[in-house]
Amino acid sequence: MLRTIVTKIFGSRNDRILRRLNKQVRIINKLEAEFELLTDEELKSKTTEFRTRLKNGEKLENLIPEAFATVREASKRILGMRPFDVQLIGGMVLNNRCIAEMRTGEGKTLTATLPCYLNALTGKGVHVVTVNDYLARRDAETNRPLFEFLGMTVGINVPGLSPEEKRAAYAADITYATNSELGFDYLRDNLAHSAQDRFQKHLHYALVDEVDSILIDEARTPLIISGPAEDSSELYMAMDKLIPILIQQDKEDTEEYQGDGDFTLDLKNKQAHLTERGQEKIEQWLMEKGFINENESLYSPARISLLHHIYAALRAHKLFERDVDYIVKNGEIVIVDEHTGRTMAGRRWSDGLHQAIEAKEGVQIQGENQTVASITYQNYFRLYEKLAGMTGTADTEAFEFQQIYGLETIVIPTNKPMIRDDRTDIMFENEKYKFDAIIEDIKDCVARNQPVLVGTISIEKSELLSNALSKAGIKHNVLNAKFHAQEAEIIANAGYPSAVTIATNMAGRGTDIVLGGNWKAEVAKLDNPTEEQIEAIKAAWQIRHETVKQAGGLHIIGTERHESRRIDNQLRGRSGRQGDPGSSRFYLSLDDALMRIYLTEGKLNFMRKMFTEKGEGMESKMLAKVIAQAQAKVEAHNFDGRKNLLEFDDVANDQRHAIYEQRNTLLDNEDIAETIQVIRQDVFNHVIDEYVPPHSLEEQWDIPALETRLKQDFALDLPLSKWLEEDNTFNEDVLRERVLAVAISEYKRKEELVGQEAMRNFEKGVMLQTLDELWKEHLSAMDHLRRGIHLRGYAQKDPKQEYKKESFQMFTDMLDTLKLSVITTLSRVQIRTQDEVEKAEQARQKIAERENAAMQYQNNEGTSSLHEKSEHKIGRNESCPCGSGKKYKHCHGSKAKY
């Protein structure tokens, strides 16, 4: 109450920020007349002037009025569009490390040119981030003439580019790119084996379009570069046959309740849980099929991988639906984004789920992969010095943007008042009655020439409604993941009089629906259109446009509420753009997923009793309150999940940052000899400590074991026992000095043979290869730790603290292993002179001749062994004459026949 009174008097923080920015807008507007008098050349020269002023120490913020005035004037001349005052405000918000909420149709693409131009003046590069390559290309090509007029270069970074094209894209002043390609390039850069193979030089300023989709909806999706792992496709097929014999029960067993099923489902988290009866049934089945021995537990350490496959199969069958969560296309499982309804080609679920779904659908099971490098969008975009974003729906997630990314959300007012009629939700007893009412509403709109956009939450629902409309004889278009290729054309026609379009949640987002249809799309279809043709198309469009406006504009129908209010607002936001008329209404039923999952059985039963007549709809404030509570529950649950993920990933992120920083230092340095020397000293001290404890008595020393270790791991054959006997002054410090001196001397001898440059390159190669291999293994170990860490809670321990503690220990162990492996490899490598190489080649040829003779003898005599031996027989345990340093039986002797 008090807050409301104070806000009325002083205004909200959003209002105060807008008032402050309006002062800047007035300054920019005053410059307009002056800039209109500039010639094209004078306007272009402003870019050089601004860059010079920045180099001379002027702050970027001081350039805002003139830079924005420059872009506005250039936009008028090149694009034929003048940015509105609210777009100038949006541009300033985006420059201030904030999120600008701008309604659909308010010109976000043009608004973005203002902060992009300003920040590109620094020469550090600007990345404009979009959700797909179509939007990246479209926005880049739309704004390219403007930026190039002002002397800025524009690049496009999308999947499928050659290294040269990608390098050119990143070298541009302003780069349009997809979020996934930026993230994968970052990971690929940190797997590169030379500095020249890296693409991303500097992460300076990122402007994220549809920021809620990327930083909220995609936050829990890690970007992963993976390599092949062990094939277990047969196991997935076997476990797939187990699922049909299992019985589901409604809720988990408790002291008060004991069900008779084998498993329960957690629909909120998409997880399955086995009951004790289920475990016993599965163990019996596994024994019968020979997967486990009698009396062996499913939870024994040796069989834990079986449990992994069982849970994957259970989730695949019971929690993931075809044409809802995925589609089958060309014999492959393609994931459908639950938020956008778009297919995500190339994406795969982890934890064996994708393989389990492949087994379920009877398509080829592709091998599991081992993670080589990974990062979440949350942590990738926090790497930028300056981050901003824009979307039509951010205010509902403002708290999360502030908490996770430190980004404040500013709601930008519309250029014209929004007059859309958002009608009260209407509830039905079941889905059939709801669909009947939707079809009646659509019939009414079609009769009045009003276009309709119907939003569904899945492909399955869109096809159900499509069938119902077809039966009713209503012409319509369907836009979902199955008809993705026709997206642009369907959206272009969605504003025609009486047009009916069914779309999954946000499929087609990023493209406005123009009342009367998109006349520009019609013109684009023509080859070399004449002025007369263009004018005729415009005139026809104007008639259609007025017809649709008179009918009430675009009518939005939501077939059910989404888990998130933001997704509902995105659907509504399709209508009422730039002051156009429009309307919206959501049709709900008690069968809807949101109701079933998030409302108690008691509430559902109470609501069922409120329906007294068949097929009647119900509108009430209480209903709106119930839905709002359900959505608030889901949003809080999802926020907690993303926050929890970030807290765990931050641990890995600190380690990732340390490793990648070290790796980039290695790539940038031509000479790492000093680093190797420091590591060598550390490794030898550590090894000697194992056998000669610091400050210990001579009797505690294990010299024979140390001699063996030095010979095996470092190829150093040192008479330590003899040194100890002959030298009375021989102590721990002398031992360390002598061992290290011999190691360095031996290493320098090798260096003299091959030359400094070759040795430096070899050192760098060994260091990088070892680091990459150990980091890959570490990621796998961290993943296993993460999966099981929640069990520590049963021991009254904080899983997060335990994860931090154990992962840190694993990280330090990995670094110790890295040092040891690098020095071991460098110490054991054998350097051969040209003379030795020639001798080895002669020995190899002799072996080849003997092998050929053996083959010839076998062919001629039909016997399995050759009795005559030529000259000297090489012993199986002797060194191979090829010079590899391996025993003959493990090298060329493995091929020779005796």
From Swiss-Prot:
Entry EC no(s): 7.4.2.8
Subcellular location: Cell inner membrane; Cytoplasm
GO CC, any one term: plasma membrane
Record-listed ATP binding positions: Q87, G105, E106, G107, K108, T109, D512
Xref: Pfam families: P-loop_SecA, SEC-C, SecA_DEAD, SecA_PP_bind, SecA_SW
Basic residues bias (residue ranges): 886-898
Cofactor dependency: Zn(2+)
Biased composition (Polar residues): 855-865
Cofactor note: May bind 1 zinc ion per subunit.
Ranges for region Disordered: 855-898
Listed GO biological process terms: intracellular protein transmembrane transport; protein import; protein targeting; protein transport by the Sec complex
Topological category with respect to the lipid bilayer: Peripheral membrane protein
Keyword terms: ATP-binding, Cell inner membrane, Cell membrane, Cytoplasm, Membrane, Metal-binding, Nucleotide-binding, Protein transport, Translocase, Translocation, Transport, Zinc
Predominant place of localization: membrane
Function of the protein: Part of the Sec protein translocase complex. Interacts with the SecYEG preprotein conducting channel. Has a central role in coupling the hydrolysis of ATP to the transfer of proteins into and across the cell membrane, serving both as a receptor for the preprotein-SecB complex and as an ATP-driven molecular motor driving the stepwise translocation of polypeptide chains across the membrane.
Membership in a protein family: Belongs to the SecA family.
Matches recorded under NCBIfam families: PRK12904.1, secA
Protein name per the record: Protein translocase subunit SecA
Protein source organism: Histophilus somni (strain 2336) (Haemophilus somnus)
